[in-house]
Amino acid sequence: MAATSALMTRAFRVLPTARTARMHTAALGGLCQSHTRMAGIQRAARQSTCLPLPRSFRHRVSTRFLSQTASSPESTSLSNEARQELESKIKAKGDAIRAMKEDGVSKQDLAPHVAELLELKSQLDPLSSSSPAPTTTQKAKPDTKQTKSDTEESDYITSRSENYSKWYNDIIRVCDLAEPSPVRGCMVIKPWGMSIWDQIRNDLDARIKEHGAENAYFPLLIPKSFLSKEAEHVDGFAKECAVVTHHRLTVDTTEGPNKGGLIADPEAELEDPLIIRPTSETMIWNMFKKWIVSHRDLPLKVNQWANVMRWEMRTRPFLRTSEFLWQEGHTAHATAEGAIQDSKDMLDQYAELCRDLLAIPVIKGAKSPSERFAGAEETFTIEALMQNGWALQSGTSHFLGQSFGKAFDVTFQDAEGKQQDVWGTSWGVSTRLIGALIMTHSDDAGLVLPPRVAPVQVVVVPIPPKKNDEEGRIALNNALDTLVADLKGKGLKVKVDDRDYVRNGAKYFEWERKGVPLRIELGPRDVKGGVCVFKYRVGKEDKETVSLDEAATKAVDGLDELQGYLLEAAKERLAAGINLMATYEQMKEALEKDEASEYNGPGLYLVPWKCDATNEEKIKEECKATIRCYPTDVNEAGMWKGKKCFYSGEDATHMALFGRAF
């Protein structure tokens, strides 16, 4: 340890820059961890059960073990056949848990599966679940090592190349975007994550209103009988629905372990159970029946910002959770053409939102019949490519035909006085866009936010003068106030980090991890020189000295340049990530072993395809690939004509985009 202290002294004597400081700190951290590990090994050796025990203690242990073995008939009651069956179950459950870990499933969601595994193991070896408690002479030691590792883990970001799924989860945790809640599959969106959603919501809400829709709100609870009215719709959501069956709790007075606890009151059971909304088509079309009478009431367009519940088995923060936030638009039209055009127009709005606000290029297209929304005649989608080569469905719009109108008896009187059925659409995006944002732009250092969606576009870090330099302090404050006013005057979102209890280096590190696009440093020397220092999150490696008089204008120009830089980088990655005209064998070989945890995967495959649900399912089973969409541009251009399906060899009907997806 003395050598370590000497090394630390020498290291901190020669730190020329903040970057080398971080490098030295990381190196010293590894060295200190090595000492900690050596100390842990020495402690473990002293406590190891492999070392000789005192004779009297050996006698007590042997006697206790023999008595337990003799009194445990379960330990010898398993037949060879039963033991083999149990071992097979243990192996299968272990493999399933490992697969979920590779997919980035949270510890909370893994817990019940781990409990099942332990239960199976206890059946195989009953003694493992009934180990004797330590005797009074054995003193329990606090698990300080575990506490330390938890602390280290909370600040550590796994590299993308090491494990892409874990990197994604680390970004969310370290950058304070969200964390697991006590409710299975539900997350707590923290202020920084929520502020990003606010930026998305504000931009999209203006687009929705420009589209002609008005905001409304509909109940969270939907009568089960409503879902039963549209057969395809209920089939699509039945397995994901959370059901409310009682309207009151009561104290359990029956004898048993739960006596005095709360139970659902048997006398408060609902005649028609309520569904926590998975989506709101049924509730909204029930209301449309009251609101639509004449052709003059059409088109009718409403939108709501809300939360929905879909009981997911395998969750991933932002990308797939049991509860999530979204907007859902619902429209009614007099003609099919009007409804289809509305669906396509809204998909264009979603694509522009991703491009202009999030700097994410997307592929627009139609879903295959197997992938359509439950109850829709056509589903349109935007698909984005993540850094690991997997696709992410980022928004959808649906042409519903007349299915919901007929299910809820929604009609209108046309100009000739005849009753006609109504045509419908629905469309939506969710907090999944935050996941897309993370996976598209972020790096191993933390979150990277395009300037237009960043909650804070510029963070200004003032560097205070010496304590007794009152003149310097006043000059710095005046320059700071002017700089901030100039930046805000240009419409920028600015944060001043003047915390006096946090070192400047720690501030830089924190805001870099949170993805703030531009940091401005302002110290006494800068003020005297009439300058400040710019440091961009990405795009420009070096710091830039800028005149205070030009700082606001330079910041606007630099942030616009950064927005374009991120979009172009994502476009290049998308273009490079699409494999053209591959054979099925080539795609299968590349995708069947591709996992979400791998970085720089094979990407997407644009191939000629004959629409066939049976073959589509076979491909999904063989290499886990799905049709992400039939891309609009290449299919409208007839690129599939004259080509053979890459799977069946028959005449193609579409160009299909295949790939693995989150």
Model regions: which residues?
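NTP/phosphate- and nucleic-acid-binding module
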Residues: 2-25, 30-32, 40-44, 61-662
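Residue-level detector of alpha-helical hydrophobic segments embedded in or interacting with membranes
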Residues: 47-49
